Amino acid sequence: ALVLHQVNLAFLLQGFPEELVWRGWLFRSLGGTRRAGAISVIAFTLLHIISNGGQENWMERILYLAMPFGFAVAAVVVARVSGSTWAAVGVHGGSHMGSLVLLAMRTDEGHPVAWVLGGALWLVVAGVVRLLARYRMLPCSTERAISL
C-alpha cells in the first residue's frame, strides 16, 4: 500500500501535473531558452518556500529551497536535452520514488543538511546530463540542446 501511495504521489499527484506546468507549459511557452529555464527554476523554487518539509523557522525555509532549486535545474536540463516534458516527469517521479527508498533506510529527509546535500546532488545530475549531451554521449532531440 505504501508503494502504491508513493507511485500515486510521485507521478499522478506531483510529477505529472507539476512538470506539465513548469517544464511543459511555462518553459516551452517562453521559448525553451536558457532564460525560460531560469524563470522556470526560480518560480518553481520560490513556490517551495511555503512547502511543509519539516522547516521550523525562516532560515530553514531558505535552506530548504536548495532541494527544489537543484531539482528544477536538473529537470530543465533533462527537458531541454531530450526535447520532452516526459523526461522531466520521469525525473520528478523518480525523485519521489527515491524518497521512499530513503524512508526505508530511515534517513532523515527533514534535516537542513539533507536539503542542501540533495540540492547539490541534483546540480551534479544536471551537470552530468549537460556534459553528456554536449559531448554527444547522450542522444539529444535537437542541435540546440547541445548548446546548453
What are these regions (language model features)?
Residues 5-145:
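Transmembrane helix-loop-helix hairpins at the membrane interface
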